[in-house]
Amino acid sequence: RIYTKGRMLIYQLNTDNNTSVRIEDGECEIEETPDFMFYTDRNFKNQVEPDLSVMPEELLPYIRKHFNVKDEDDVILISILIVSSMLGMNFNHPVILIQGEKGSGKSECLKKLEMIIDPKDSGICAYTSNKEAIVLRLSKSYFTCFDNVSFISKAISDLLCSAVTGASDTTRRLYTDTEERIVKLHSIIGITSINGVARSSDLVDRSCLIALSRLEKSEIKTEQSVMASFQKDLPFILGAIFNTIAGVLSDRKKVKARHKIRLADFHEKAIKIGRVLGIEEDKISDILFQNRLDLSLS
């Protein structure tokens, strides 16, 4: 879905007309790309065409409108997570843990993230505890979603941590019991749950928590109307994201933060995204450290 080289990024939009968004030298444009540039899985879904006239400062209002997060810090955090997820896999991304009680719209939130970052024909999938099934999903997806997770075993937790930092795993070849094949795992991961499912310290250190508010009766709408409203704004959201990425890629200013979370490269990218969105470095660091504390207590 995403190709990066130096300060240049290409995001694959549409396989029917071979179009992509190219970001370089602070500019975004839609252009044709050669067939061989991307490997396209059968589950690939074309992205809507972004409105590249939408500026970065318009991103936060759109996120505030469409994501039912608890407070303004979470509006900032989920915006940073979305933009960073579209910067490619040349650094490690946190697991996005979406948590909230019943009726808070967790699945809809995850669907929206997938539609922005890496839309698929299958949509989001229910969680399975089968390791081989999870390995297959992680090896096939840029953004891998697990919906309605109630428990994560130690083995699966370790597997998810490995996928965050990049690793290899083995699975049996089809129709054989003895032959193995090696698969590479490096994926951005989104998970929804009612209660905290990140129990191991390694997974906590590699995650960011997004807390959702329970919807009031007056706020409850049909999923069809919610998603229709979101799809209407999706070209504008994408335009704001791509222009934010253009600012991030052209930012050569050094990050001042002396202390960083475990995913230090992500922390630096978060600060650069914050700069483009008009948010001070210290504010971004405070949000990340507070989120780590909230996650350890959840």
Give a label for each model feature.
Residues 1-6, 73-74, 79, 254-258:
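Short glycine-rich, low-complexity/disordered patches
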Residues 1-54, 136, 243, 247, ...:
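N-terminal nucleic-acid engagement/recognition segments and initiation subdomains in replication
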Residues 11-13, 144-146, 190-192:
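Short hydrophobic-aromatic micro-motifs
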Residues 27-140:
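P-loop NTPase catalytic core of nucleic-acid-dependent motor ATPases
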Residues 62, 66, 85, 116, ...:
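Conserved, well-folded catalytic cores of nucleic-acid-processing
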Residues 82, 107, 113, 147, ...:
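Conserved RecA-like P-loop NTPase ATPase core
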Residues 91-94, 119-126, 131-144, 152-157, ...:
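Feature primarily recognizes SF3-like P-loop helicase cores of small DNA viruses
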Residues 150-151, 161, 165:
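Catalytic acidic motif of RecA-like/P-loop NTPases
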